[in-house]
Amino acid sequence: MKLILCTAIALTLAGCGGGGGGGGIPAVAPASAPAAASPVVADAATVVAVRPGVSPFIAFVDLRVAAGEVLSSAHYRIEPKPGSVSRPVDVDYAASYLSGRGYAASLGSSGSTVTVPVFGLYANYQNLVDIELQFADGDVEPIQAKVDTAAYTDPNGIYDRPVILKARTAGAALGFDFFYMKSALGSPVVVDTDGQMRWVVPATMSSASSAVRGNGFVIGDPQAPRVRRLEFDGTTRDTALQAPDVTNFHHNIDPGKVGLLGEVDAIRNGVQAIESTLVEFDPDTGALIKTWDLGDTLSRAMQAAGDDPAAFVRPGVDWFHMNAATYDPRDDSVIVSSRENFVLKIDYASGDLLWILGDPAKYWHTFPSLAARSLTLGSGGLYPIGQHAVSIAHDGSLMLMNDGLASVNQPAGAPAGEARGYSAVSAYTIDAAGRGATEATRFDYGQSVFSSVCSSAYEAAADGSVLVDYAVADNTTHARLVGLDPGQNVVFDFEYPTTGCNTSWNAQPISFDAMRFQ
């Protein structure tokens, strides 16, 4: 057994303003020569240098592994700031992952080099980073690095200056400690539940259509049929979507059966199909797995019951306005949100309509074929109106952000349905066989916040805590990010300035406190 030695090295990282310029995300070359640094003598490994990433929230710790040592994994933990109540950033890399990404060279030979990408750093702070190297013989070597980072000034003047309306306090139970905002102004922005920025990179492409997949971001291009893979080390890879009729992504990217679900615009028979097409795609290859034309789905259902769909399905018009979807493995189906109309469930394989849940005071309910497919909501429940962010909660209920906005694109003189002056998080239990639904839970913040469009609410997998994003609160001037414990008590409430939905059109928890790269 070797001696276990803890070494400390303090190095200052040059900063990067980040966030808004350049037309793309500059790639970091993992195998580049390390900057000059004073070597620290250690046993199985020595710290050679610490190099800055593309923003102050990212750094690269270069290590020299002694001859004969075979690395099995590298782990790091960033000590929280004093007074923080968020869990520390905690990341583990398998040696095979580091090698595959070019961060480990000639493992086991003399002078092997290993680079540990460290993300989630505090900006303008001396970060204490505890690194552990696990070797094949079972030995573990701790190395401690003090990493001074530069200040970060958000070029948008938004994300580095939240107003803390309610701070999370010590002991407040919450099933997540980090979340990311999907920004129309650049890359996703990761924030901890203290309100501290913990990750962003320079980018000009909107990250509104984004999701976490395989410990990295998948971002759909709002201007082209293209997918961008954005790693937490700041590197990127673009892949074309193999769908010749698709023109661009819009709204969200959601979990699918095999790949990811993307809301896209498309051209059909020479006419633009606006926000009514859903695809499942492989984010690594761009291959198309499945396509659902919701206009076709509803037309078939209407025609089968004797209705003429021409007055409802209107190509070239934003008649549907899809903004979210999710796969339901319990019956191999897909749940889709149409802001203008309703929530509907379709069969995964056939695309056939299974049921509709929506406000019967809207235009769609004037068609007998669609009314016959609708679920009746139990007494006292709120129908989904202008809803966003459909998902399956831990108890199997259908969760969504119930914005409260009536329809805006129905034909002249057609009923727009109910409108509310507040937004709510609603979760429904569905009785498909009995054609009924019950609003099982609701959080409406005392009916004090109205966020008419965009917005989201998602559970944390750990315990059912919920992150609520009021994207356009206060008459579209602020985004409000609110954390709820499992009892729907408000744990934190952060406010950011916004124009339209740009700041945080949608937001989700992210597990920076337990991330494993295999």
Question: Which residue ranges define each predicted feature?
Answer:
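Bacterial signal peptide processing site
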Residues: 17-21
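Short, well-ordered beta-strand core segments
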Residues: 101-105
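Sec-dependent signal peptide recognition
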Residues: 1-7
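C-terminal motif of bacterial Sec signal peptides marking the signal peptidase cleavage site
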Residues: 12-15
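Long, low-complexity intrinsically disordered segments that are proline/alanine-rich
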Residues: 22-38, 43
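Histidine-/acidic-rich catalytic cores in large beta-rich domains
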Residues: 38-83, 88, 93-97, 107-115, ...
